[in-house]
């Protein structure tokens, strides 16, 4: 944490030094008031004065004559001077130097205090922000890790709803198809076409082998089918050899009405499945 906050601390320290230097350059030393050689009181002033350069921030000269300059060698030590004590205060209406009210405060001191407080506020705020970021970062990582799972869950919900919608539409389509097929079955059916599975088999062999032929007989070659018929025909029971397979279409019988059509408010119901002829003979299948 301190390594991450070190650039901010360095930046704050540099800004503090620049503010101090700017305050020092803008307001130099304060030359206290003094009595000149003619015993005339001279008021104190802040360096630099109006007619001095920006670099004249040092109080120079002698105790009897003070001025602002930029040379550190010519600096005046005002602590050793004793002519800055005002004499004849009632005449000039000026307090004495030793009195509490005569303490001269440099002008740059308030600016220095304000600048130091501002820089300290920046440093403290930066440290608090770094600590908060370090403390809250582990709590945000699990939330980000859980975010893809929630996104996948949100993605699956529309898929489920679309699947249920498609199932509902398919069920409606199937019911519509069933109703249309039932209405179509009410009419007469055309006779079914004869399958061409017996493409190259004689009729006598087909009549004898019809009861024990597999369902996928059509995929066999004609020569192989003939051999299979001749081979299986030897094992047929003599009791079922004379039976023939009916190839004619099954006659349709009229469907009885389940609800009387004379009653008001009801439609005539028709059975979707045709009734089989009870007189049709059923031949049992024989497997060897």
Curated annotation (Swiss-Prot):
Residues 161-188 have a biased composition (Low complexity). Residues 161-198 are annotated as: Disordered. It is found in: Endoplasmic reticulum membrane. It is a single-pass type I membrane protein. The keyword Nucleotide-binding does not apply. Plays an essential role in the maturation of presomitic mesoderm cells by individual attenuation of both fgf and wnt signaling. Inhibits both wnt and fgf signaling through the regulation of protein maturation and cell surface transportation of their receptors within the endoplasmic reticulum. Interacts with fzd8 and fgfr1. 'Shisa' was named after a sculpture form, common to southern Japan, with a large head similar to the Egyptian sphinx. This is Protein shisa-2. It comes from Xenopus laevis.
């Amino acid at each position: 944490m301190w390594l991450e906050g070190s650039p901010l601390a360095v930046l704050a320290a540099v800004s503090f030094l620049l503010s101090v230097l700017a305050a020092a350059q803008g307001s130099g030393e304060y030359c206290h008031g003094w009595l000149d050689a003619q015993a005339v009181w001279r008021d104190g002033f802040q360096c630099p004065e109006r007619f001095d350069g920006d670099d004249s921030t040092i109080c120079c000269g002698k105790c009897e004559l003070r001025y602002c300059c930029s040379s550190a060698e010519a600096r005046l030590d005002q602590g050793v001077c004793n002519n800055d004590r005002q004499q004849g205060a009632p005449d000039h209406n000026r307090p004495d130097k030793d009195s509490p009210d005569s303490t001269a405060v440099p002008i740059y001191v308030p600016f220095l205090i304000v600048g130091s407080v501002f820089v300290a506020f920046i440093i403290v705020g930066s440290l608090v922000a770094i600590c908060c970021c370090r403390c809250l970062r582990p709590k945000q990582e699990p939330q980000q890790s859980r975010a893809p799972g929630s996104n996948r869950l949100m993605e699956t919900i529309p898929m489920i709803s679309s699947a249920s919608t498609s199932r509902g539409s398919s069920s409606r389509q199937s019911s519509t198809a069933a109703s249309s097929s039932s209405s179509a079955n009410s009419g007469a059916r055309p006779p079914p076409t004869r399958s061409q599975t017996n493409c190259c088999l004689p009729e006598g062999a087909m009549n004898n082998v019809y009861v024990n032929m597999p369902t996928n007989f059509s995929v066999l070659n004609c020569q192989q089918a003939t051999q299979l018929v001749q081979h299986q025909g030897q094992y047929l029971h003599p009791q079922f050899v004379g039976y023939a397979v009916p190839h004619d279409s099954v006659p349709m019988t009229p469907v009885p009405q389940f609800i009387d059509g004379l009653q008001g408010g009801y439609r005539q119901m028709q059975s979707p499945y045709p009734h089989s002829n009870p007189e049709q003979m059923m031949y049992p299948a024989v497997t060897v």
